[in-house]
């Protein structure tokens, strides 16, 4: 016959085991959802670091895991191979090209505009080179931000200013080399991006000739919005974990709201991106807008930009950009 002492001991052990299993179940139920985010660490990645470091992902039970990637092709490749669920800052041309090859792969929850107010792409000229406008670059040796899209845009802007191929030399150059190339005088001018422009001007090695080039020369107005990049979720993420995707978008929207009204967000650039501390307080930022807040006019300008790219031969066929804007 089992003694009272043994019965009590066995009961206690059983209750302990049940309690442990219950706690494990609770912990599992409350575990944050992991979301892998591909991040190209430049200024346009700012919303990710604001949402992460201000606890906005944590507030919606998301464990955001950064996958550092350099450039659009790397981000798209990681989306295809399911190594990331989200691309924090993917060029829209790259996104639409990916959707032509694999429809529904890239879905933007927010997009970023740039123009003369929200500066990004800029033609610069080195110190000592005689040019006061883009039209003065005939005979110049010009560097460009890398990739087919940037080369196409540089040529389009030069053509709009009366310069045809053969009137200049154009070489694509990795972005980290732009500032030193201007300092060394390796190139006379450049189609470059922020924060390189601000760095060059602060150093005195180059000056800006004109910024907001896509808005002016592609969309036809200085104050137009060129929707050139944005934050995209994979179609599989949206299909398989719609609630997590919705919570991610909510955290992202909070970060965008902070960027619009709180200049202290710039502190997140210094330790997380290629932006040096000296220029973080003044470097221009693009205009971050959630897809749900886009007006009909915004969508029309977005379509106009992508149509221009298609007509230029970079995309193989027309794309309806609204198909790949995701709202919740």
Describe each region flagged by the PLM.
Residues 59, 115-116, 214-224, 288-299:
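Short, solvent-exposed loop/beta-turn-alpha elements that line the ligand-binding surface or hinge
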Residues 46, 106, 114-123, 206-207, ...:
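Small-molecule pocket liners
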Residues 306-328:
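C-terminal solvent-exposed extensions
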Residues 21-29:
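C-terminal segment of classical bacterial N-terminal signal peptides
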Residues 238-314:
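Secondary-structure end/capping motifs
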Residues 33-161, 169-172, 188-194:
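Short, glycine-/small- and polar/acidic-enriched structural segments
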Residues 91-93, 102, 177-270:
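Pocket-lining segment of extracytoplasmic ligand-binding domains
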Residues 2-15:
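Bacterial N-terminal signal peptides that target proteins for export
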């Amino acid at each position: 016959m089992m003694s009272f002492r043994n019965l009590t001991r066995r009961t206690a052990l059983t209750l302990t085991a049940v309690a442990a299993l219950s706690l494990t179940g609770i912990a599992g139920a409350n575990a944050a959802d992991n979301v892998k985010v591909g991040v190209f660490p430049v200024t346009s990645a700012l919303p990710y670091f604001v949402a992460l470091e201000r606890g906005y992902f944590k507030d919606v039970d998301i464990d955001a895991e950064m996958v550092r990637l350099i450039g659009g092709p790397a981000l798209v490749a990681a989306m295809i191979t399911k190594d990331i669920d989200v691309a924090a800052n993917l060029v829209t041309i790259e996104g639409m090209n990916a959707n032509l090859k694999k429809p529904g792969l890239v879905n933007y929850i927010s997009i970023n505009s740039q123009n003369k107010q929200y500066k990004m792409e800029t033609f610069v000229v080195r110190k000592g080179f005689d040019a006061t406008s883009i039209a003065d670059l005939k005979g110049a040796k010009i560097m460009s931000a890398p990739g087919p899209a940037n080369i196409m845009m540089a040529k389009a802007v030069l053509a709009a200013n009366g310069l045809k191929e053969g009137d200049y030399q154009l070489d694509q150059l990795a972005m980290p080399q732009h500032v030193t190339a201007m300092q060394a005088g390796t190139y006379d001018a450049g189609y470059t991006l922020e924060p390189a422009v601000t760095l060059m001007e602060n150093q005195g090695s180059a000056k800006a000739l004109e910024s907001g080039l896509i808005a002016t020369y592609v969309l036809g107005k200085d104050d137009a919005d060129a929707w050139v990049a944005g934050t995209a979720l994979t179609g599989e993420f949206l299909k398989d974990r719609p609630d997590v995707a919705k919570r991610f978008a909510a955290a992202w929207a909070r970060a965008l709201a902070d960027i619009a009204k709180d200049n202290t967000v710039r502190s997140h650039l210094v330790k997380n991106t290629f932006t040096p501390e000296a220029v973080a307080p003044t470097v221009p930022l693009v205009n971050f807008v959630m897809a749900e807040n886009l007006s009909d006019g915004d969508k029309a300008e977005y379509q106009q930009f992508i149509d221009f790219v298609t007509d230029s031969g970079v995309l193989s066929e027309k794309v309806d950009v609204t198909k790949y804007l995701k709202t919740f």
